[in-house]
Amino acid sequence: KAAGASPKVLNLFAYTGGATLAARAAGADVTHVDSVKQVVTWARENMEQSGLDGVRWIVDDALKFVRREVKRGRQYDGIILDPPAYGRGPDGEKWVLEQNIAEMLECCARLLAPKGFLVLNLYSMGLSAMLARSAVRQAFGPAAEEQFGELYFEDRAGKQLPLGVYYRMKR
């Protein structure tokens, strides 16, 4: 909401739309991108059941989409990025996190407005929070605010089971 009356938020690898719906409920104009048509249909149903509307739904390979958005000169006030370790686009495009994350972050850096925010979740045991921070900083430069760390699940015995990492920044 700090971005203005209707901030533009891009949700990539958006799956069933939890973050999309949270952003929309907060008043953002949201573009939801996922490569699986059935998942986007499910997300749209979730929106309808939540009493919301006005989301831009895109079934596309996320990397191809952001490349086109860069060419179009688009900007977003916020980008939510939740890529899988491995996946396929709608036309069989291959996504491998370790191979594609640098280009994805570079494109996102060009799309993010000057006072925008980025939320990045990575669920790959091969990447630490420090590596994620380094990759984001390489693409975006220094952040005005940043927060990063490990994502984990705590079991009943109090043992922390690792899930991945998060990185949040504001320009």
What name fits each language-model region?
Residues 112-113:
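Helix-to-beta-strand junctions that scaffold the AdoMet/dcAdoMet cofactor pocket
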Residues 24-25:
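Gly/Ala-rich phosphate-binding loop of Rossmann-like dinucleotide-binding domains
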Residues 6-15:
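Conserved class I S-adenosyl-L-methionine
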Residues 117-171:
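C-terminal catalytic and target-recognition region of SAM-dependent MTase-like enzymes
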Residues 29-34:
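Conserved SAM-binding motif I beta-strand of class I
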Residues 36-80:
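S-adenosyl-L-methionine
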Residues 39, 59, 77-107:
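Mobile active-site "lid"/loop adjacent to the S-adenosyl-L-methionine
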